Amino acid sequence: MPSILLLGSGFVAHPTLEYLSRRKENNITVACRTLSKAEAFINGIPNSKAIALDVNDEAALEKAVSEHDLTISLIPYTYHATVMKAAIKHGKHVCTTSYVNPKMAELEEAAIKAGSICMNEIGVDPGIDHLYAIKTIEEVHKAGGKIKSFLSYCGGLPAPEDSNNPLGYKFSWSSRGVLLALRNSAKFYENGKLVEIDGKDLMETAKPYFIYPGYAFVCYPNRDSTVYQERYQIPEAETIIRGTLRYQGFPEFIHCLVDMGFLDETAQEYLSPEAPALPWKEVTARVIKAESSSEADLIKKISSIHKFKDEDDKKRILNGLKWLGMFSSKPVTPRGNPLDTLCATLEELMQYEEGERDMLILQHKFEVETKEGKRQTRTCTLLDYGVPNGYTSMAKLVGVPCGVATQQILDGVINTPGVLAPNDMKLCGPLIDTLAKEGIRLEEEIIDEE
């Protein structure tokens, strides 16, 4: 009887739990810091039990891991290496949806020696994106073709009808991580040249990206795309860019917040949680160093530190800042620094309301040179909506692949020990097939150029 330990009870974990509970032989233990939370989480789910576990207690964590065949780690990625060490020590397996970081990668030799399978990067991005990238690249190479360009963009967004705020974005989890990602620098290949973009300039590089006529997407690059030349075995590719999709208007608004200093984590006494809560207009004035907190002075200062594209852009962004309350007398929720204080307001105003749904869009676009020297464009596209008052698209598309990979480890389909991620068709093929049965697949299209 396979035994599974599920660490975490976030929104992604429930689709994982539901998928694995379909197999009657699986015994699933859900661990949370408080027993009541774990019990509420498994309510109505067969063959599951709840335990209280503090993952900061390494001895208790190791004991729990050692008592199960496989541990699913859906807690913050900083804990994954600790979970993997405990599993490897006892010859057990692990599954995560996170990128393999250096601390995880260095456990490769120990995992192989112990016969432990530590599967990672099996959500949507990373995860489903890898599956179809590997599939397409292998198909092209087997046919004697070359990948000349690889573009991959993904966005978790509100459905168009629910994108009703100045950012066209909503938070289903902490806004802090979303905003911090906007400060990351980017590195990619474009037309054979290495391009590097500083984090502060990232939003300026955003440009329209066409997938379907009904959606106004913009794209910008993510972190280091250059590593995928080797990982995906496409040394011939002159352009390799992985990036993020947002609705139009998002980058300009974020760029203004960056210029104003609201993505800054520097502690400020006047934003201390112990200090009296100041009105928003006073905080805005202090952060941007305006002459006063009057709306006229705030707008004057913002106009001097941020270059608006045109008058329409200026009007839209200033209206957005007003919508957030940044020129108002409403007290802020002080969280120590400008970034976290802004996050408190974003999380208050930009949550999904009851009955609203999210959307996930993912597309790979390959420019291919065939064996015969002809050009073709290949696309793999996923457009998925959440269910109002049910699973979000993001939860399903991260949680179900994690559940599928877990089951394939237990069934012996994934059977190579080590620290793994989807890197070849031996791993990717069965995952693609099983996910398709769950209704999770990318639509593939080939357009031959004359």
UniProtKB/Swiss-Prot annotation:
GO biological process, one term: lysine biosynthetic process
Keywords assigned by UniProt, alphabetized: Amino-acid biosynthesis, Cytoplasm, Lysine biosynthesis, NADP, Oxidoreductase
InterPro entries in UniProt: AASS, NAD(P)-bd_dom_sf, Sacchrp_dh-like_C, Sacchrp_dh_NADP-bd
Pfam families registered for this protein in UniProt: Sacchrp_dh_C, Sacchrp_dh_NADP
Metabolic or biological pathway: Amino-acid biosynthesis; L-lysine biosynthesis via AAA pathway; L-lysine from L-alpha-aminoadipate (fungal route): step 2/3
Record-listed E.C. numbers: 1.5.1.10
Chain residues that bind NADP(+): 9-12, 32-34, 54-55, 75, 97-98, 124-126, 174
Catalysed reactions, as listed in the record: L-saccharopine + NADP(+) + H2O = (S)-2-amino-6-oxohexanoate + L-glutamate + NADPH + H(+)
Residue positions binding L-saccharopine: S98, Y99, D125, R223, T244, L245, R246
Keyword Amino-acid biosynthesis among record annotations: yes
Superkingdom of the organism of origin: Eukaryota
Cellular component aspect of the GO annotation: cytoplasm; cytosol
Descriptive protein name: Saccharopine dehydrogenase [NADP(+), L-glutamate-forming]
Family to which the UniProt record says this protein belongs: Belongs to the saccharopine dehydrogenase family.
Subunit-structure text: Homodimer.
SUPFAM superfamilies cross-referenced by the UniProt entry: Glyceraldehyde-3-phosphate dehydrogenase-like, C-terminal domain, NAD(P)-binding Rossmann-fold domains
Cell compartment(s), UniProt: Cytoplasm
UniProt-recorded Gene Ontology molecular function terms: saccharopine dehydrogenase (NADP+, L-glutamate-forming) activity; saccharopine dehydrogenase activity
Entry keyword annotation includes Amino-acid biosynthesis: yes
